[in-house]
Curated annotation (Swiss-Prot):
It comes from Sulfurisphaera tokodaii (strain DSM 16993 / JCM 10545 / NBRC 100140 / 7) (Sulfolobus tokodaii). GO terms for biological process: amino acid metabolic process; regulation of translational fidelity; translation. The active site is at T102, T178, D179, K257. Pfam families: Asparaginase, Asparaginase_C, GatD_N. This is Glutamyl-tRNA(Gln) amidotransferase subunit D. The gene is gatD. PROSITE patterns: ASN_GLN_ASE_2 (PS00917), ASN_GLN_ASE_3 (PS51732). The keyword ATP-binding applies. Transmembrane segments: none annotated.
Amino acid sequence: MLEGYRGKALEFLSSHNVDVGDLIELQKDGLSIKGVVMPSYSKEDDIIVIKLDNGYNIGVSISGISNFKLVEKKRQNIQVNKGEQKPLKEKSEVKIISTGGTIVSKVEYETGAVRPALTTEEIINFMPEINEIAKIDAEVLFSILSENMKPEYWIKIAESAKKALDEGNLGVVIAHGTDTMAYTASALAFSFKSLTGPIVLVGSQRSSDRPSSDSPINLYSAILVAKNSPFAEVTINMHGESSDTYTLVHRGVKVRKMHTSRRDAFQSINDIPLAKVFWKEKEIKLLRNDYIKRKEENALDAKFDTRVFLLKYYPGINPEIIEYLISSGIRGIIVEGTGLGHTSTEFVDYFKKATKDGVFIGMTSQCLFGRVNMNVYTTGRLLQESGVTPLEDMLPETALVKLMWVLAHESDLDKIRSLMLTNFVGEINYRHVPEYFPRWFHDGIRLQ
């Protein structure tokens, strides 16, 4: 099956009896190219995608190809069953729960497909050094792109993590796509009232078939943290710099993906990470001592009301959107306001009506760094008088997930406000220091 191919490329490959996963060799522009045919996602209909021996994919136009040869056909039908896992002969210390993403996926070169590593043995083969630090067990809970994550899946992840910890695992590693990982981390953090061990979310910015992949180091250090760290919090463990020296363990409610593709994309905001992990030395260096310690039991309370909305203010936005949201049944709105927490004064009357109808309005800042302070300017004071609740230094995404959790437990508006301002798991930092703000590079660089 020539997945993704159409037009000229489909006709060309079909005429040579080539399928995805077949090994081919060709000559083009004086170069000899040999590799495995991969599925195509190209907008052009004359491109063949080939995986080279070095792990990289290239696109080759069929125009000008000479001496095309099918070297070897290899086709296997692979079925991935959700929840499939292989029983362990001995009790595990760390449970790995896969939800999707590239972190524990591998390329099946016989078919050209990317599939999750299903068994404990496959993960050990992925990075044999894991055997040196922990006994692991692995499970595929589901395999989805992180943009398809939903609150109902958060509950399933939380239940699976609790089960793993109740069974005696020292910690849990959750493999997750990076784009919405921070949302899931916040959801799990609010769902657990106590934990016997850490829940470590881990992902990969570079897929495992690429030489520059961050998958092995991120996974290895996440397992190290899950087993050996003294804290029992929901965290995110990702590269701390662009090289492979260390990873950083971020508190799940104070972290954000701040770059589309860098390996060190995840950064703690208005906070410092919990720990730095030097994976080669197998060392966890604690960066703070105010972490939540391991408890005697795992207490789970995972419920979410999805009738919420994240509203990003911009100049000229029509305040009538608030009326629409109220009429659609929304129970709470998190506003990403400007600066210290502002919208135009045109919103004041609409916010008054919303709060009168029992709708919670919470204010965060688009600046991300710093906290909202709605007592400085007249606009902020007017917004507060209309019923808007300033949410300290909470990240907008964290505030949104927290509101889902709060609304699932409370209906009284005053109590909702009180809960939103309660610092449950470190989502609010009352004291900021200059070190929390990144120092951007200000010296000149020469661009070639």
